[in-house]
């Protein structure tokens, strides 16, 4: 008798047989995020004219986008994931990513010009804006990289596995498979100066290839070489003298990370305030809504530094609960990837897994001072409506991988019974 699987019986938008656990943990994270966005933002919203002096301004925006994202997730979960395997879909996704990245170049027209569809902040042009709709270009690019890399691995992977040694053909296929991640990441980094998102996009492609490839020794060597280069770079930067204006804000951020108290009034101010927030929270925190650091110390506590407010208000216990929810979310995605009926579905789920895991690790590393400030948000928790929508679309893809894989297993079981 077939093993009874834990699947939902929801019929919303025809979604029968979806992974209940993944849906529930996603809902918990969204609700947790809404609570923390309100707690972190209500003070600033209530005293800011741009927010209409409405303490619930950002909460209402985030709640609306979360609802839109959940509808999009359920809709995408009804689309057979093999649709994303069609060549024209892959090419369209990559072409659209390139086009949206090129739109960022309209910044040359200057702020306020009708032909400028980009927004620049802190030295990086990350956003495109069409009317009242704005979003980070990196978000759709991440989806395009996941889809394109999955398609290439599915198309060329079987061919590469047959080769016993790293021949020229092997390297050529490897370059082709890594091209979407590395290529689009480099293109985005050059055009937008958004190096943190570019790094995430490139690593997503590499992780997907590493997760699939049976010959892992070369990747361990590459990782060691990369770590060594980063170490040398940090050492060289730490030995230099004062930072010149020409060196740019990125190098300044690295210097501020290495020696935060020399930059405590400018570049390191937010990072140090975040550490004070984390340290003052203790085991159980000051209580929801009782943060002191959000009262002007941390400029935008509802964005990429929201984890520090979680620690201050809910303490180690609250932060641990949040991390456990993320771990369980990643576990569900990993489980779906392992049980996918084919390589393409497995790679789709792996790509989403790597995206979420990378952002969680990088965000918490920045907030705790383990990395320089990158501007990477905490998935489903930080304020950011369009980022939430795109991430929920990715989770919709994962839900469909589980749905169709389970359907295929059920069909195989029925066929076995009739034999």
What are these regions (language model features)?
Residues 89-95, 175-188, 195-242:
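Hydrophobic alpha-helical segments of polytopic membrane proteins
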Residues 34-37, 73, 146, 150, ...:
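Alpha-helical transmembrane segments of polytopic integral membrane proteins
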Residues 27-44:
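Alpha-helical transmembrane segments of multi-pass membrane proteins
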Residues 19-26, 88-93, 343-351:
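Membrane-interfacial loop-to-transmembrane alpha-helix junctions, especially the N-terminal start
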Residues 2-21, 45-192, 364, 368-377, ...:
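Membrane-helix boundary/helix-loop-helix interface segments in multi-pass membrane proteins
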Residues 316-360:
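Hydrophobic transmembrane alpha-helices and their immediate junctions
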Residues 112-113, 119-127, 220-318, 343-344:
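Hydrophobic, glycine- and aromatic-enriched re-entrant/interface helices and adjoining loop segments
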Residues 199-218, 292-314, 318, 377-389:
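Interfacial segments of multi-pass membrane proteins
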